[in-house]
């Protein structure tokens, strides 16, 4: 039996006990790009949150590297999968570099102390996302488009196998 990087089996998604969609079958191979297209309210964001483990499935299974997503610890899941949502809470007195560096938390331990390699991973991710010039700027004082680039950098520097991007 072939294992996919990410797979769903008879997945049902939604909030509470009301499914937005059910019977979802998705399979993704390494390097593959999948795009979800649909109208507002169709459940695209809900599906991404369920794939990331932020929402529990209402039915079915999410597999990551052939293993049920619920079997992963939060840290192990974060090392394999990153979710970028379009809106995030504003933080006080946080530079864009520091905000992006939160993507390294799965690797830094509880104290969150960045090694030189972690700092380089953050810098590289900011460059890939076109946000290196924002590194020293306050995250609250940049445009929405710039904020999206920093959010993307945070997801990239997490170095996951799976990137889930909601309205990148």
Annotated model-derived regions:
Residues 163-167:
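Catalytic Walker B motif of ABC-type/P-loop ATPase nucleotide-binding domains
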Residues 101, 116-134, 159:
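Conserved ABC ATPase "signature" region
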Residues 37-39:
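The feature captures the beta-strand-to-loop junction immediately N-terminal to the Walker
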Residues 113, 138-142, 146:
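Conserved ABC ATPase signature
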Residues 6, 21-23:
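Conserved structural motif at the start of ABC-family nucleotide-binding domains
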Residues 52:
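Helix-to-loop junction immediately C-terminal to a conserved catalytic motif
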Residues 60-68:
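Conserved ABC transporter NBD signature motif
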């Amino acid at each position: 039996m072939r294992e996919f990087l990410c797979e769903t089996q008879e997945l049902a998604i939604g909030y509470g006990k009301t499914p937005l969609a059910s019977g979802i079958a998705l399979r993704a191979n390494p390097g593959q790009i999948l795009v979800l297209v649909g109208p507002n309210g169709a459940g695209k964001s809900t599906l991404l949150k369920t794939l990331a483990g932020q929402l529990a499935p209402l039915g079915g299974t999410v597999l990551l590297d052939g293993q049920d997503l619920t079997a992963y610890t939060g840290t192990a899941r974060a090392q394999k999968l990153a979710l970028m949502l379009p809106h995030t809470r504003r933080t006080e007195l946080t530079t864009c570099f520091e905000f992006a560096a939160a993507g390294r938390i799965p690797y830094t331990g509880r104290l969150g102390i960045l090694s030189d390699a972690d700092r380089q991973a953050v810098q590289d991710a900011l460059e890939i996302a076109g946000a290196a010039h924002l590194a020293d700027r306050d995250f609250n004082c940049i445009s929405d488009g710039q904020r999206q680039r920093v959010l993307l950098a945070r997801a990239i520097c997490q170095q996951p196998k799976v990137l889930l991007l909601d309205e990148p």
